[in-house]
């Protein structure tokens, strides 16, 4: 497991109080992990803080699954390194 995904999983487990086994790449924050809209906002804020990134509201709405978050954060950090 890559470092980004590991940190994302830790944040989700801490914020949502779910079992680690449920936090798989295809798991939906709302449908599979039981997050509500406030939880989703808190997850986005934690991702921004942990990875020192900015996630716009438009992008946040598209981050539905664990893998969506992983792919976006990975791309953001890769793009950030190239500057």
Curated annotation (Swiss-Prot):
Gene Ontology terms: biological process: lipid A biosynthetic process
Predominant subcellular localization, coarse grouping: cytoplasm
GO molecular function, one term: acyl binding
UniProt modification remark: 4'-phosphopantetheine is transferred from CoA to a specific serine of apo-ACP by AcpS. This modification is essential for activity because fatty acids are bound in thioester linkage to the sulfhydryl of the prosthetic group.
Subcellular location: Cytoplasm
Residues of the signal peptide: none
Pathway where this protein functions: Lipid metabolism; fatty acid biosynthesis
Record keywords, A-Z: Cytoplasm, Fatty acid biosynthesis, Fatty acid metabolism, Lipid biosynthesis, Lipid metabolism, Phosphopantetheine, Phosphoprotein
Role, per record: Carrier of the growing fatty acid chain in fatty acid biosynthesis.
PANTHER family, per database record: ACYL CARRIER PROTEIN, CARRIER DOMAIN-CONTAINING PROTEIN
Stated name of the protein: Acyl carrier protein
Gene: acpP
């Amino acid at each position: 497991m890559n470092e980004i995904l590991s940190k994302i999983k830790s944040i989700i487990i801490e914020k949502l109080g779910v079992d680690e086994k449920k936090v798989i790449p295809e798991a939906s924050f709302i449908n599979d992990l039981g997050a509500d809209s406030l939880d989703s906002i808190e997850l986005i804020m934690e991702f921004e803080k942990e990875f020192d990134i900015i996630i716009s509201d438009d992008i946040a709405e598209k981050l539905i699954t664990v893998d969506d978050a992983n792919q976006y954060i990975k791309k953001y950090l890769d793009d950030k390194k190239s500057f």
